[in-house]
Amino acid sequence: MKQILSLLIVLLYCTTIQAKERVVELPAFDAWSSTSIEIQKIVLNDTATTVYIDAFYRPHNWIKIAKDSYLQADGKQYKILSGIGMEPDKEIWMPESGTYSFQMIFPPLPENTTTVDFTEGDFEGSFSIWGIHLDGKPAFSPLA
């Protein structure tokens, strides 16, 4: 009986942990500064926000994500912590295909966040994506 009760408690705990993770696939966004990077998905949980990126650039050339990159939500900045498949401020050399995938890790966003901006900063050539929708709503366009 104790084993069954212990198993039920573990399953309930795992379900609770899993429920706190939110995944937004191919989020809509309002504007971007470059077509060289695209967000494939964003995973939000209580320990981190992980942004999955596909980069497109000329083969055997490089792109770089600045170490001061951040997400901004409701006026607050969440600076990049690390990366998977990339390191902030280090060149990412593009393979022959011209496509490279990586992840950027940021602090957790508040649970009620509906939109977020990504930017490297305000300098020439910086990557920025504004109005990334975490709520499943379509992008806003003044042209629509």
Language-model features: locations:
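Low-complexity, acidic Ser/Thr/Pro/Gly-rich terminal tails and inter-domain linkers that flank the onset
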Residues: 21-46, 75-78, 82-86, 143-144
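Generic structural detector for well-ordered beta-strands
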Residues: 43, 54, 93, 103-107, ...
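Short, well-ordered beta-strand segments enriched in hydrophobic/aromatic residues
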Residues: 48-58
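Envelope-exposed proteins and targeting segments
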Residues: 49, 67, 100-102, 114, ...
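The feature marks short-to-medium sequence segments in extracytoplasmic or secretory-pathway proteins
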Residues: 56-95
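Pro/Ala/Gly-rich low-complexity, hydrophilic intrinsically disordered segments
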Residues: 128-144
